[in-house]
Design a protein with these regions (language model features):
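Terminal peptide-recognition signature
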Residues: 7-8, 26, 38, 74, ...
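A short acidic, glycine-rich active-site loop
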Residues: 46-59
Length: 167
């Protein structure tokens, strides 16, 4: 939701001053990492926005990614299950990505009427998996499984689902 983006952005900005926090681990609640933004709650209202308001939303989502990248603590994404849309972006913006074989990561923006380069994907994803592979994922919205994500260099390690937080 819009509020979730703002809350996460603000959290990562505050972490710059949190000397007592040594690392950040992002994990989903339940069987999935993050399925992305609610299409009806986010995409629907975006259609009715005028350019200045749309730019404000784009800046807010971009500011979340920037806040993550400027966070002085290492950010680890512990990915199990679905990791899509904004969830895939948050995993991409993390310093390390630990996944499971059953993970499915997808950049689905073009499938819901948004640009495939949303939230900095065109900048960061090619640096992780290479230009050709990034283009494939961003153009098609195809999901990659955990083993393929490891082969492509997207995941730093593939773990058993029950130990992804332990690793």
């Amino acid at each position: 939701t819009f509020a979730s983006y703002a809350e996460l952005r603000d959290l990562f900005q505050r972490l710059r001053y949190a000397d007592d926090v040594k690392a950040v681990v992002i994990v989903g609640a339940g069987d999935n990492f993050c399925s992305g933004g609610d299409v009806h709650e986010i995409i629907g209202p975006l259609i009715g926005l005028k350019a200045p308001e749309l730019l404000m939303f784009t800046r807010m989502t971009g500011d979340l990614v920037k806040a993550m990248r400027h966070c002085p603590q290492p950010i680890v994404a512990a990915i199990d299950g679905v990791c899509a849309g904004a969830g895939a972006i948050m995993s991409m913006a993390s310093d390390l990505r630990l996944g499971t074989a059953r993970s499915k990561t997808a950049f689905l923006f073009n499938r819901v009427g948004l640009a495939g380069c949303d939230m900095g994907a065109c900048n960061m994803l090619p640096r992780i998996v290479g230009q050709g592979r990034a283009s494939e994922l961003l153009f098609t919205g195809r999901a990659i499984g955990g083993d393929e994500a490891m082969q492509w260099g997207y995941f730093n390690r593939v773990c058993a689902p029950e130990s992804v937080l332990d690793d």
